[in-house]
């Protein structure tokens, strides 16, 4: 038996006609990318589910609402006029007064409404206005020289006229029947008369006519108020307000130009008017009125004391 030996050939060197099936590389890559994308989508969906399942544990900061009362700045900024309240805030008292006067001149109905609705001027506010006119008058005097000279008079003539005109305009407001309270009228007249006292006596006689006329008008105003005050409660406002002494003092400072007011006081209150006229004419200093004796506790000190049973 003859055995034939064949040479051994390794398998990888054999001529193998059976081939493995070929694969499409592009389809493989697209398949893998699709699987990867699906896995990512599934993972993100899980994260969303976990986030939505426990919102209380989320560290996210919620937006805060803007506090009330704060206005947001307008994004469409453009030029525009001021609102009326803001415009009025920028006006000075003089500008406001000039504006109102101009409007009232064009619209008389508005003028009447302002007069009827505006608050009544008080004594303090009115005297403050008069004090401003007086301060302007005093500031107009030139430096050096005599304050009563003709040169000084010419320098302050305009301010003097403004002061006297303001007195003429304000005084009737505090007279009856517009003012019903005698105490209010008397208090204003007291302050206004002191302003006239402080006016200078000019070297030229003709220049003093302004002051003389002011005294005459003020004396008439005093007489009117005294007459009305004497009708109310027996003139108690005059008796216990010390107005008899004040009127006598005004008459003394003015050189007797307030005599009309003194005469009205004498006629309206009788004995009190006599006491006032005597003191104004230069009565002895130890002559005291009954009211003064009562206030000082000396009433009846000069009368003899009664003796015996009562």
Curated annotation (Swiss-Prot):
One of its GO terms (cellular component) is cytoplasm. It is found in: Cytoplasm; Nucleus. Disulfide bonds: none annotated. Belongs to the cut8/STS1 family. Residues 52-63 have a biased composition (Low complexity). Residues 14-33 have a biased composition (Polar residues). Keywords: Cytoplasm, Nucleus, Protein transport, Transport. Residues 1-86 are annotated as: Disordered. It comes from the Eukaryota. One of its GO terms (biological process) is protein transport. Binds the proteasome. This is Tethering factor for nuclear proteasome sts1. Its main location: cytoplasm. GO terms for molecular function: proteasome binding. InterPro entries: Cut8/Sts1_fam (IPR013868), Cut8/Sts1_sf (IPR038422). It comes from Pyrenophora tritici-repentis (strain Pt-1C-BFP) (Wheat tan spot fungus). Involved in ubiquitin-mediated protein degradation. Regulatory factor in the ubiquitin/proteasome pathway that controls the turnover of proteasome substrates. Targets proteasomes to the nucleus and facilitates the degradation of nuclear proteins. It holds the Pfam family Cut8. Signal peptide: none annotated.
């Amino acid at each position: 038996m003859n055995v034939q030996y064949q040479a051994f050939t390794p398998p990888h060197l054999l001529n193998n006609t059976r081939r493995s099936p070929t694969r499409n590389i592009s389809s493989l890559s697209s398949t893998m990318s699709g699987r990867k994308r699906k896995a990512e989508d599934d993972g993100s969906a899980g994260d969303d589910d976990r986030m939505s399942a426990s919102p209380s544990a989320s560290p996210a900061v919620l937006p805060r609402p803007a506090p009330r009362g704060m206005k947001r700045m307008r994004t469409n900024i453009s030029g525009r006029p001021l609102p009326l309240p803001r415009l009025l805030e920028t006006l000075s008292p003089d500008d406001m007064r000039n504006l109102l006067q101009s409007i009232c001149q064009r619209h008389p109905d508005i003028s009447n409404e302002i007069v009827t609705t505006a608050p009544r001027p008080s004594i303090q506010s009115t005297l403050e206005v008069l004090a401003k006119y007086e301060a302007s008058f005093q500031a107009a005097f030139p430096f050096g020289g005599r304050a009563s000279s003709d040169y000084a008079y010419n320098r302050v003539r305009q301010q003097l006229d403004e002061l006297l005109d303001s007195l003429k305009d304000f005084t009737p407001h505090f007279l009856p029947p517009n003012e019903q309270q005698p105490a209010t009228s008397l208090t204003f007249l007291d302050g206004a008369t002191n302003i006239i006292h402080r006016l200078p006596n000019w070297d030229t006689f003709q220049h003093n006519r302004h002051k003389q006329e002011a005294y005459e008008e003020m004396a008439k105003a005093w007489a009117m108020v005294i007459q009305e005050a004497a009708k109310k409660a027996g003139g108690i406002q005059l008796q216990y307000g010390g107005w008899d002494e004040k009127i006598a003092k005004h008459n003394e400072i003015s050189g007797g130009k307030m005599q009309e007011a003194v005469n009205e006081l004498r006629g309206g209150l009788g004995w009190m008017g006599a006491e006032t006229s005597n003191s104004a004419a230069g009565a002895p200093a130890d002559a005291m009125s009954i009211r003064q004796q009562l206030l000082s506790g000396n009433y009846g000190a000069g009368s003899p004391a009664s003796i015996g049973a009562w």
